[in-house]
Amino acid sequence: MANKFVITWDNMQMYTRQLAEQLLPAEQWKGILAVSRGGLVPAAILARELNIRYVDTVCISSYDHDHQRDMTVVKAMEGDGEGFIIIDDLVDSGDTAVKLRQMYPKGKLVTVCAKPAGIDLVDAYVVDIPQDTWIEQPWDMAVTYVDPICKK
């Protein structure tokens, strides 16, 4: 994908706090189910903002940095998801979301970002992303020194 959307750590916190506002009142939730790995950071932020202490993971592998591949469920939580926020960083093609809906039909599936192909599969999200755009997450990047333009 030629187009990129960069999310900084500050943006991730801001977007996830906006998502938390959509999930009030906090007392309705038994816990948070983070989709590993993309949902881990948003889950920590949601846990803080909603004062939720019970956090579990569902581990689904479908990407190698910037390439989608076959989906594998590595670890799953028991139950149908009732009373749980299921959080991932992004809904893209919707393949992971479909799997999560099958596994946890009573959970509230939310993402920080959503692309058009998967948007109808989530209950809440914050940022619209064009389908042809790759998202660079803060945990995949580092701040580095760049020479001034005049030195090139």
From Swiss-Prot:
Coiled coil regions, renumbered to chain: none
Pfam families with a match to the protein in the record: Pribosyltran (PF00156)
Bilayer-spanning residue ranges: none
Residues given in the record as 5-phospho-alpha-D-ribose 1-diphosphate binding sites: R37, G38, R69, D88, D89, L90, V91, D92, S93, G94, D95, T96
Recorded topology in the membrane: Peripheral membrane protein
GO cellular component annotations of the record: cytosol; plasma membrane
Binding site for xanthine: D92, I135
Database matches in PANTHER family: XANTHINE PHOSPHORIBOSYLTRANSFERASE, XANTHINE-GUANINE PHOSPHORIBOSYLTRANSFERASE
Description of how the protein assembles with itself and partners: Homotetramer.
Function: Purine salvage pathway enzyme that catalyzes the transfer of the ribosyl-5-phosphate group from 5-phospho-alpha-D-ribose 1-diphosphate (PRPP) to the N9 position of the 6-oxopurines guanine and xanthine to form the corresponding ribonucleotides GMP (guanosine 5'-monophosphate) and XMP (xanthosine 5'-monophosphate), with the release of PPi. To a lesser extent, also acts on hypoxanthine.
Name of the protein this chain belongs to: Xanthine-guanine phosphoribosyltransferase
Species, as recorded: Aliivibrio salmonicida (strain LFI1238) (Vibrio salmonicida (strain LFI1238))
Organism lineage string: Bacteria, Pseudomonadati, Pseudomonadota, Gammaproteobacteria, Vibrionales
